[in-house]
């Protein structure tokens, strides 16, 4: 039995890690940290996991990273905080999955420009943890940068077309997310009266996930692409629906495109290709699946592909556990084999 610590256990990603790890047969959570809630019972703060595993016996702790000695650490801290923690764990030889944006960029200047932070804890061996593209690298690394929620759905929606050089350099992603993507701390943006019965775009051309999507697709296509991304906030709790647009470089049919996607993802349990019907948020709610469908081509050669993920699972904590399973040599599906909550 491998041991786990969760640094930053009061947010939504920490909560989801606890929920999902309660179904994992090969790990036990020993430490959940929180400076603010230190000394309080875990299940008083997270009553949804009461009576699961050893959670009734756990209290939040304020532990310095130097004093953590578990096999795996999930770092569920805000951007900027992880860079002070992860290098210490890295030096101790602990397997770390960081859910912040601090280690997603090989180009540190790009990170500093988009996040407005000076990076003080660079780890050159950190690997971008999108298993469908980087599984072999993940297996060999002890520091994994868990992808962002929007980039996960966006990259997976277009990866087969980019890898096969079937679309031109212009790719547009239109994503709509549930409110939980904004985090556990309430704001005017996420206040119920402002979100309910409403829909709006934000950070229309300058969301920090834009360069993350772009650099991964650039790598996959081995060329510089012109990636545009605009997010919207939906009046729902969970889920991201991404509509991807580009223009085909060749005269291929919808059937050809579907065949390309099925071949590209044939060994990927967590990617489901829908030839017919629409992918939906309810279909992936609570799951680690990315559902991909659409594949429609208009009279101008524009192809539209649609993906759906749960932003807190495949877009965060579920993918983090998937990465843990890979680096620890567990079955990749362990703790994650659950279907969507539909309706």
Swiss-Prot record:
PROSITE patterns documented for this protein: ARGC
Subcellular location: Cytoplasm
Keywords from the UniProt entry: Amino-acid biosynthesis, Arginine biosynthesis, Cytoplasm, NADP, Oxidoreductase
Major localization listed first in the record, in broad terms: cytoplasm
GO molecular function: N-acetyl-gamma-glutamyl-phosphate reductase activity; NAD binding; NADP+ binding
PANTHER family linked: N-ACETYL-GAMMA-GLUTAMYL-PHOSPHATE REDUCTASE, CHLOROPLASTIC-RELATED, N-ACETYL-GAMMA-GLUTAMYL-PHOSPHATE REDUCTASE, CHLOROPLASTIC-RELATED-RELATED
Protein name (Swiss-Prot/TrEMBL): N-acetyl-gamma-glutamyl-phosphate reductase
Species in which this protein is naturally found: Methanococcus maripaludis (strain C6 / ATCC BAA-1332)
């Amino acid at each position: 039995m491998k041991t786990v610590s969760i640094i930053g256990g009061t947010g939504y990603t920490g909560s989801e890690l606890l929920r999902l790890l309660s179904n994992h047969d090969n790990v036990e959570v020993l430490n959940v940290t929180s400076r603010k809630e230190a000394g309080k019972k875990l299940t008083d703060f997270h009553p949804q996991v009461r009576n699961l595993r050893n959670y009734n016996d756990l209290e939040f702790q304020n532990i310095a990273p130097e004093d953590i000695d578990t096999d795996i650490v999930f770092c569920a801290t805000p951007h900027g905080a992880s860079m002070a923690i992860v290098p210490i764990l890295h030096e101790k030889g602990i397997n770390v999955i960081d859910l912040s944006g601090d280690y997603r960029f090989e180009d540190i200047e790009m990170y500093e420009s988009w996040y407005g932070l000076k990076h003080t804890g660079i780890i050159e061996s950190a690997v971008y943890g999108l298993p469908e593209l980087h599984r072999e690298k993940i297996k060999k690394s002890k520091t994994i940068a868990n992808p962002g929620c929007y980039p996960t759905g966006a990259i997976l929606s277009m990866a087969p077309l980019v890898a096969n050089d079937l679309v031109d350099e212009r790719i547009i992603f239109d994503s709509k997310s549930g409110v939980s993507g904004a985090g556990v701390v309430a704001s005017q943006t996420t206040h119920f009266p402002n979100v309910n019965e409403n829909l709006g775009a934000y950070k229309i051309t300058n969301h920090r996930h834009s360069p993350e999507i772009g650099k991964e697709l650039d790598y996959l296509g081995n060329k510089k692409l012109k990636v545009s991304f605009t997010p919207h906030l939906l009046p729902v709790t969970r889920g991201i629906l991404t509509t991807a647009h580009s223009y085909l470089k060749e005269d291929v049919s919808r059937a050809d495109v579907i065949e390309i996607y099925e071949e590209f993802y044939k060994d990927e349990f967590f990617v489901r290709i829908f030839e017919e019907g629409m992918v939906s948020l309810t279909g992936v709610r609570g799951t680690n699946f990315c559902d991909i469908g659409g594949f429609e081509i208009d009279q101008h050669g524009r192809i539209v592909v649609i993906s759906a993920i749960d932003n807190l699972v495949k877009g965060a904590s579920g993918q983090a556990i998937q990465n843990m399973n890979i680096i620890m040599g567990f079955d990749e599906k362990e703790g994650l084999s659950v279907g969507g909550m539909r309706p």
